Amino acid sequence: MQKKPTSAYVHIPFCTQICYYCDFSKVFIKNQPVNSYLEHLLEEFASYDIQKLRTLYIGGGTPTALSASQLEVLLDGLTRNLDLSVLEELTIEANPGDLDEDKIAVLKNSAVNRVSLGVQTFDDKMLKKIGRSHLEKDIYENIDRLKLAGFDNISIDLIYALPGQTMEQVKDNVAKAIALDIPHMSLYSLILENHTVFMNRMRRGKLPLPKEEVEAEMFEYIIAALERAGFEHYEISNFSKPGFESRHNLMYWDNAEYYGIGAGASGYVNGVRYKNHGPIRHYLKAVEEGNARITEEHLTLREQMEEEMFLGLRKKSGVSMTRFEEKFERSFDGLYGEIVRDLVQQGLMQVDGDRVRMTKRGLFLGDTVAERFILE
């Protein structure tokens, strides 16, 4: 009998504004069938007969684009049949612009115990430049309200290497983030995705981005500054105070299975990676017909081993060679020994006892290093 996943990702695709860099599955909330969407999403969730979860993550889009009453329906529907004694972490993503007191009260009265705020930058001019509608003052107001409501597990997302951004602006952002006195931060360099405003501008030569060496300096500065402030750099883009690592995201990097619920959501169950219908109307119809999925991919053993390496090497702790061999019944040294020795020689990887992991230099070249673990 297959072991059931103990994590679930729930996708709320609605936004009150569309950011210029975002390619996630999302729609402008106005005139959307939000109540019907929530009803269908909860129907899909119920179809898996989920009773025990260790982590539950509600992302988007923007979950807090929902009204307070809609949030209440969602949270109640998701947790009604769950054994809350084993639910370690329930995260919800929020935008500083739309998290008001009523919504915070709903979160407080639910099983939510972790809030992730999409700050992106503290610079009002830059916020406008990247298509965000909130202001710096909204960030402080929301953090204060969340702390007052008793939330101590708060995370923020920041983006660096933004158009026209200087090293001084990055330093200012990091200093303001540290001053918030919160236990977790995710910092991502800007990645240009197709079908975004920024990619269109880039193609027209109208997007002045920092040079690659400046981006590398920004990354090095961020790591050093946050480590000095007591944060552990536990994954390429993530930093936490001790004990406040994102358990849900660690699940992804441990290559564990999880349910993906909602329009455009991806999941990994019984060795099958799947993706749900993206457009809202298509998703609603698919749920009514009893199957929200549009694609399914049965991973081969080779693909599973490759993913174990790609994902695991994102973590500071890297990959356990013993666990790898127990999981796949293959010799780690036979598959990857030569590659690891070569990367160690280049200063991109190190071997600590049972574990292989990337060096700081390796982390910056993460994708290039990961490509070496594709099996021929």
What are these model-predicted stretches?
Residues 355-359:
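Minor-groove-contacting beta-hairpin "wing" of winged helix-turn-helix DNA-binding domains
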Residues 330-344:
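Short amphipathic alpha-helical interaction segments
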Residues 7, 214, 337-341:
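Auxiliary N-terminal substrate/complex-recognition segments of SAM-dependent methyltransferases
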